[in-house]
């Protein structure tokens, strides 16, 4: 752009030695030069300007048509979306109503199952207590029996002498003899 401006400025400073030039000084130009320049601009610029305006008009009209088509499509999609929204709202209301009754049913089922589990745990607890009681009783019996046996063995060992030992053996032999006679 600067080169074009420089070339017009340089045209105005050429020496006037019989050559053709454009006078760029507005105050020094004559009406003929102005009318020639304006005529050339109007003649050649009219077509260019007309084409530019026609192109701009076509683009604006195309944009308006596209906008109308998009608007129509948007309105159609909006109506479909509203219909879907109404349907979803109705389904949501139905789910809400069904959900409350389902929640109550699940709540009752949960309470009943929890009650059954608590009963089972109570039964297991009672069985465990009974088992532990029986085990404790058996342990006490074993200890009492062991202590009684140890006491009896201690008493026998302390009071046992050879004479008593021989008498016991003789008595047992006698018992075996009597048993043998009975079986024969």
Swiss-Prot record:
Record-linked Pfam families: ATP-synt_B
InterPro entries noted in UniProt: ATP_synth_b/b'su_bac/chlpt
Keyword Chloroplast applies: yes
CDD domains per UniProt: ATP-synt_Fo_b
Molecular-function annotations in GO: proton-transporting ATP synthase activity, rotational mechanism
NAD listed as a keyword: no
Homology family: Belongs to the ATPase B chain family.
Function: F(1)F(0) ATP synthase produces ATP from ADP in the presence of a proton or sodium gradient. F-type ATPases consist of two structural domains, F(1) containing the extramembraneous catalytic core and F(0) containing the membrane proton channel, linked together by a central stalk and a peripheral stalk. During catalysis, ATP synthesis in the catalytic domain of F(1) is coupled via a rotary mechanism of the central stalk subunits to proton translocation.
HAMAP family registered for this protein in UniProt: ATP_synth_b_bprime (MF_01398)
Protein name stated in the entry: ATP synthase subunit b, chloroplastic
């Amino acid at each position: 752009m600067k080169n074009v401006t420089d070339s017009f400025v340089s045209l105005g400073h050429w020496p006037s030695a019989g050559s053709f030039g454009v006078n760029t000084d507005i105050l020094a130009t004559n009406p003929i030069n102005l009318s020639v320049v304006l005529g050339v601009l109007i003649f050649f610029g009219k077509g260019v300007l007309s084409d530019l305006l026609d192109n701009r008009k076509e683009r604006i009209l195309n944009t308006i048509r596209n906008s109308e088509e998009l608007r129509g499509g948007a309105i159609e999609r909006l109506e479909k979306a509203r219909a879907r929204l109404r349907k979803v709202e109705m389904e949501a209301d139905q789910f809400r109503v069904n959900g409350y009754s389902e929640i109550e049913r699940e709540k009752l089922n949960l309470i009943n199952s929890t009650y059954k589990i608590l009963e089972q745990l109570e039964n297991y607890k009672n069985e465990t207590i009974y088992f532990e009681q029986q085990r404790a009783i058996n342990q006490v019996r074993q200890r009492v029996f062991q202590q009684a046996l140890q006491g009896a063995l201690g008493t026998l060992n302390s009071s046992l002498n050879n004479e008593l030992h021989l008498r016991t053996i003789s008595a047992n032999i006698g018992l075996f003899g009597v048993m043998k006679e009975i079986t024969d």
